[in-house]
């Protein structure tokens, strides 16, 4: 058995539900490929698998990276979301313990994700189970399927130095400093993209090279020795928007979501830039600050989620992931689709 299944598509397209069905039917294990569902303090707002779902099927790379910077290490008021235990048949290896320990002063990278996903895939296949990779983060999926350009590890000192500089300057001032240090980045990075600006500055400061100079190396697929089968979910746009609206409205009226955000709100300034991009988090905080009503917060968040889903839909339509694309007008149509034929033929 050498198969690896990948289920990709926009948010609220039914990926997780389909993965659960396949995992239960074919002795599978689900591996996350969503850049927001890695965070351990915000499982609800990121629509991570529930505890019940994790008990039914083993899930990995969910809710295990902290949203906080190193200067909040002393805080211990947050409960970790427990991961499913690895079956004893997995060659007596506890995958969660074998995963690289991520200190909160290190930004989680795509390269780290690929390394850890591959480690789990190898162990799952060794245990004669089926790895099912599920997610909507194109950068994770593309890197896992086609490989990633390797960039030198950035030291904690450089990271802290750049973070401090970014906090002191306006975005435009920081952008200008980046262009002075790395003129090539002007062609690829916009001044509104804080995360990419910081990353490019770190690389240029440490290596004296542009981050884009590393993009000339040949890519090698981390999964080249496996039989990788990909399915891309492309629902009707109106169905997708309806799913987005309904899911967030349901989450926002659940007291657990408000509790989750209330818990992290006092430490908002310590949350990483990446984690702050979790859809809905800022709107719920505005509600807690009495700047918005809950209805206004829901409406604004829903609009942003729909816009994000639209961008994902466009990305998956245009990218050459070379998978089977499944178009559907309703969720029942998705669940009735003969995906078995796609994966096993």
Swiss-Prot record:
EC number(s) recorded for this UniProt protein: 2.5.1.75
Entry's Gene Ontology BP terms: tRNA modification
Site (Interaction with substrate tRNA): 137, 159
InterPro entries with a match to the protein in the record: Dimethylallyltransferase (IPR039657), IPT (IPR018022), P-loop_NTPase (IPR027417)
Cofactor requirement: Mg(2+)
Binding positions for ATP per the UniProt entry: 9-16
Recorded superkingdom: Bacteria
Annotated positions binding substrate: 11-16
Family indicated by similarity: Belongs to the IPP transferase family.
Purpose: Catalyzes the transfer of a dimethylallyl group onto the adenine at position 37 in tRNAs that read codons beginning with uridine, leading to the formation of N6-(dimethylallyl)adenosine (i(6)A).
Oligomeric and partner information: Monomer.
Name of the molecule in the record: tRNA dimethylallyltransferase
Organism from which the protein derives: Orientia tsutsugamushi (strain Boryong)
Taxonomic lineage of the native organism: Bacteria, Pseudomonadati, Pseudomonadota, Alphaproteobacteria, Rickettsiales
Gene field: miaA
